Amino acid sequence: MKMEEFSPPTSPNNHVIVQANPQIAAALSTNSPMQQGIPPQGHQNPNEQQQQQQFVGQPPMGGMGGPMRMQMPQQQIRQMPYPSPQMRAGPPPPQQQQQQHFQQMGIPQQQQPQQFTPNGQSMQMQQRPMQMGMAQGPGPSGHLMGMVGGPPPQHMMQQQGGGGPPQFVPNSSPMPLPPQQIMQVQHQQQHQQPPPSQQIQQPPIPQPQQQQAPPPQMIPAAVPYGSIMEKSKLDDLMQQISSTTVLEENVKDVLVEYADDFVSSLIDKACKMIKNREVKKIESRDIEFILKNVYNMPVVPRAASHNFGSQTEVIDLSKEKFVPTEAHKQRVALLKKQIKKL
């Protein structure tokens, strides 16, 4: 008796179901062993190979996107009497599964540097894809859709292109400290800070009182300030001329004022004269010239020759007229009397 071949009904939704669930597609495409018979070794159904390629090429949709597992062709596998070395070692780590998954999807990966344990053994860092729009997650498998990456490891090693020795790179973001350590650090900083300088108000030093000297007694001067001649000198001069003559106070004041005015006018005329010569020093010959030409006064013998006018001009004292005064006449009379007594 022949067995009737059973074929699934064709419908437009079969293609959608096959793409949505690869296991159903594999079951539908696989013939029963009674129809197909025992396949030879190394033989693989072309429908299974095509479905396997479609399953591998399809990217994971939505969600957390864990590593995709490869679907092996449904073949009769003989059970091994003892486990294989791969089974002994256990299932491959999720890192290798993830690496295989991204290699099949054609996504480039960035090779992470190696990290060394304290025992000196190198431990390969997890390889994660570096693609626009994807972020690294803290778990073993990277998340694709907008997941925020966890903190990077503290000590990383940069692998050089020439295969040089790895270099330690310090972590850019410091690890948060526990609150106890933070309090200890703040306490140490407060102790290290110098205390604010305290201004010590020193008592004012008593200054020794200086003994105030009594104000000097103002003695009225006989000569006013700036006067050239004093009254006492006038008395001495009068005693030389006539011992019997006595000057009154009013006469003395007038004589002092007259002497000051005479000296001031004499100096004023001398300054005007040297100004014409463009010099800044008054000489004795300037005063002699003014006394002779302006006041008609005889000059002293030491200034008999001068350079004013012609150089050959010489003053002759014999030509000067001497007019004796009354005091001179009295002195001469006294001398004559004394001579007669002798």
From Swiss-Prot:
Spell out the Polar residues composition-biased ranges: 12-35
Among PANTHER family, the record links this protein to:
TRANSCRIPTION INITIATION FACTOR TFIID SUBUNIT 12
Query: What ranges does the record list as Pro residues composition bias?
Result: 193-218
Fetch the InterPro entries from UniProt: Histone-fold, TAF12, TFIID_TAF12_dom
| Changes seen on gene knockout | RNAi-mediated knockdown reduces nuclear localization of taf-4.
Protein name per UniProt: Transcription initiation factor TFIID subunit 12
Any Gene Ontology biological process: RNA polymerase II preinitiation complex assembly
Alphabetical GO CC annotations of the entry are: nucleus; SAGA complex; transcription factor TFIID complex
In this UniProt entry, which cysteines form S-S bonds?
none
> Where is the protein localized?
Nucleus
Quaternary structure, from the entry? Interacts (via histone-fold domain) with taf-4 (via the histone-fold domain). Interaction may facilitate the nuclear localization of taf-4.
Location of the region described as Disordered in the Swiss-Prot/TrEMBL record:
1-221
